[in-house]
Curated annotation (Swiss-Prot):
This is Hemoglobin subunit alpha-1. Belongs to the globin family. Involved in oxygen transport from the lung to the various peripheral tissues. GO terms for cellular component: blood microparticle; haptoglobin-hemoglobin complex; hemoglobin complex. InterPro entries: Globin, Globin-like_sf, Globin/Proto, Hemoglobin_a-typ, Hemoglobin_oxygen_transport. CDD domains: Hb-alpha-like.
Amino acid sequence: MKLTAEDKHNVKAIWDHVKGHEEAIGAEALYRMFCCMPTTRIYFPAKDLSERSSYLHSHGKKVVGALTNAVAHIDDIDTAFSKLSDKHAEELMVDPANFPKLAHNILVVLGIHLKPHFTYSVHRSVDKFLSTVAYVLASKYR
Ligand code: HEM
């Protein structure tokens, strides 16, 4: 999926409002995913996945931090996510069908919390960006 110049502009603009809130946004997106799509929990055995757990918050910060890095390298997400894709494919062995599930929940959280900035065109651009991230993350699977 090709991100247009307008998409890149929209994603960078909304990400200015994400920066500094990576942990809260990430934790809520993960919590919603674990709640609404409970099969995703199987990759986190023995972890405390409750709403206020320190694990959920620290992991959420890492996930959205990685997205902040992808936004900073929006012209070359493949390279920016190369190691992360390897890790999910080779080490964590996460079924790539799960990536769009987290992408969906991140989109929901941004829509709720950044509503004034979440115009139709920003919605479309962020959806395309997260779909690209999910696609790139799945690219090392063979
Ligand atoms: C670890 C990002 C989707 C399962 C990680 C890490 C990052 C990350 C940054 C930490 C890597 C490290 O410490 O070296 C992302 C992004 C995703 C995504 C950006 C999609 C938008 C998923 C999904 C699952 C998953 C959908 C499973 C349902 C895991 C697991 C770990 C991990 C099990 C290891 C957790 C731990 O060490 O405690 N991910 N991830 N990821 N991810 Fe993902």
